[in-house]
A protein has these predicted regions:
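A short glycine-rich, Lys/Arg-flanked "PGG" loop and its adjoining helix->strand segment in the class I
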Residues: 1-9
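Short, low-complexity, polar/charged sequence segments that are solvent-exposed and flexible
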Residues: 4, 29-33, 123-124
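Conserved class I S-adenosyl-L-methionine
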Residues: 9-57
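Rossmann-like AdoMet/SAM-dependent catalytic core
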Residues: 63-249
Length: 252
C-alpha cells in the first residue's frame, strides 16, 4: 500500500483457507489411495496413474488451460501448508490499517455496495464491516464453488469456521510431506451439521458426499475408496472457490 498514490489501485491474490477444502480433499483421497496401493512416492508414475483413475473424468469436465499431468504436479502433489493460506477476515483489516479500502474482487461475490443509493457515503470501516458480513452469507459458495441458488442458508458460527480451519490444517499435516500410515482426519461434526441446515439441496448432497468420502478414506479398502469417490457425483462436480484476487484503492 505504501507504493500507491492516493486513488491508486493495488491487486493481490491469495488462497482462501476455508475455501481450499475441496482441493485439499482431492489431495487427501489421492494420498490415501497411494497408501492403500503401496505407492510410497507421490512423484512417481504409479501415483500419476492413480490420479488418472480418480480424477480423469472430473478434470475433463472443466475448462482447463493446462494438461492433466501439469495439474497433478501443481495441485495434487505439490507440498502446501496451512501457514501459507489466508482469509478475508485477516486481509481486510490489513488493507484498512494501511490506509486503503476494498475496491473489488474476483470471483465477484461481495454485495457491499448492492442496492445502495450512490449518495449514501460510507466510511472504509463501515464498508469493510458490511463486506465481512456478506462473506458469511456467501460461505457455502466459498466452500463448494456452487453459485447461490437463492435459498436461505444460515451464517456459519465461529465453531464452524474454527472446525474448517482445524480440518484443513489436519489435512495439510496428513499430506505433508509423504505417504504414511497416519490416520485420516474425521469430517467435522460442526461443518456437517451446518451444511445439513442449508436449504439448498445441492449443498446437502455435497455434504453427504463429503461425509461418505472421509468415512471411506478412514477405512482400509482401496476398492471401497475408489467406488465411493465414483459415486459422489455432487462433490466431483465442485472445485471450491479457493483462489481470489482482491483490488484495493489508496485513500485520499
Amino acid at each position: 500500500c505504501d507504493l500507491l498514490s492516493p486513488g491508486g489501485l493495488g491487486v493481490i491474490s491469495f488462497i482462501d483457507r476455508h475455501a481450499t477444502l475441496v482441493h485439499a480433499t482431492r489431495q487427501l483421497i489421492l494420498w490415501k489411495a497411494c497408501y492403500l496401493s503401496g505407492v510410497e512416492d507421490v512423484q512417481s508414475e504409479d501415483c500419476l496413474n492413480l490420479a488418472h483413475t480418480l480424477y480423469d473424468d472430473d478434470f475433463a469436465s472443466i475448462a482447463a488451460s493446462r494438461p492433466f499431468d501439469a495439474w497433478w504436479k501443481d495441485a495434487l502433489i505439490s507440498p502446501w501448508t496451512n501457514n501459507h493460506l489466508w482469509t478475508y477476515q485477516e486481509i481486510i483489516p490489513i488493507i484498512e490499517e494501511a490506509g486503503c479500502e476494498f475496491y473489488g474482487s474476483s470471483p465477484k461475490w461481495a454485495k457491499v455496495d448492492s442496492f445502495d443509493w450512490y449518495k449514501n457515503l460510507h466510511t472504509s470501516s463501515e464498508r469493510h464491516h458490511s463486506l465481512l458480513e456478506s462473506w458469511g452469507s456467501a460461505f457455502p459458495y466459498f466452500m463448494t464453488g456452487m453459485p447461490p441458488s437463492g435459498q436461505k442458508n444460515p451464517l456459519p458460527s465461529l465453531e464452524v469456521l474454527r472446525s474448517v480451519v482445524d480440518f484443513v490444517g489436519d489435512i495439510s499435516n496428513y499430506t505433508s510431506p509423504e505417504v504414511s500410515a497416519a490416520e485420516v482426519p474425521e469430517y467435522p461434526a460442526a461443518l456437517h451439521q451446518y451444511f445439513n441446515q442449508c436449504e439448498d439441496t445441492s449443498i446437502n448432497k455435497f455434504n453427504s458426499d463429503m461425509k461418505m468420502l472421509y468415512d471411506a478414506a478412514r477405512g482400509d479398502s482401496l476398492d471401497n475408496l475408489l467406488a465411493t469417490y465414483r459415486s459422489c457425483k455432487v462433490f466431483r462436480g465442485t472445485w471450491g472457490a479457493h483462489y481470489h484476487y482482491v483490488c484495493f484503492v489508496k485513500s485520499d
